[in-house]
Amino acid sequence: MAAYGGDASSAEARRRSKLSAGPHHRDRELAPLDKDRILSCLGTRWLGRDLRLFAQLASTNELAISLAQKGESGTVILAEVQTRGRGRLSRHWESPSGGIWMSLILRPDIPIALAYQINMAICVAVCRAISNLLGLNPGIKWPNDLLIGERKVGGILMEVQAEGKRLEYAVVGVGINANIDPSAFPDDWMATSLSREVGSEVSRTALIQRTLLEIERAYENLGSKEIYDEWRRRSATIGRMVRISANSGELVGEVEDLAEDGALLLRRDDELVRVLAGDCIHLRGMGGL
């Protein structure tokens, strides 16, 4: 989530080599994640009680989907490193050591049309965990990026399977740049990390525990006005000039509000357009580029 890219060019390969050997891997050397430590003080009732920790995976979401197809529920897949992590629109998602890369298997009893409630709740929950543990105030860039100021610190990727009009399962990937040196990434990736923002290494164990607890609480409150209100209040997109790329084409305008169903309300001249999905780019400043 820290950054997206396409096919690896030679320059990209050099950057990934730097990511593998750069200063951000200090956290893994000094404090690798330990399953027993995470579980020992985990405050959840059901989420993450089946926790599977890997030194390296291609993609936590890929494994979680295969387990969800076998009936798993509440399981959390956690990896120190992802080699083929992905973000929205199948973009590459850099997942070096020092971050938190995990996927959750959820089985909400809701229609597929209400799946947006899950994304909304998870975004709010991760923001709450970061805020409560570290005193930072993350914003949410529509639809699922987490920002500190203008820089990306995390993100959510939800993949769902429906049975008729009902949701069979949702696999939700959560990526957080915890102890990663953002200077390892190109400036145009606009990344930051929690350790950079607080000025010291953060406890990934404590953050995982708090994040899972907040997710469980928010998930059990799906569809509530409380979740929507906080999601809207934390928006880093309302009031911004944006460019939206969707299947129907490209839209540019000012974001007037976010609807309760997760739609972005975009003002274009005298027209208010509802956007349910798409790639959102914040344009610089209120007036655009």
Where are these regions (language model features)?
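A short coil-to-beta-strand element that immediately follows conserved catalytic motifs
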Residues: 75, 137-141
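N-terminal lobe of the biotin/lipoate ligase/transferase fold
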Residues: 2-5, 12-132, 154, 202
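Conserved active-site carboxylates
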Residues: 145
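Short conserved micro-motifs on helix faces and helix-strand junctions that flank
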Residues: 82-84, 142, 172
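Long, positively charged amphipathic alpha-helical accessory segments at protein N-termini or as interdomain linkers
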Residues: 3-5, 14-29, 46-47, 112, ...
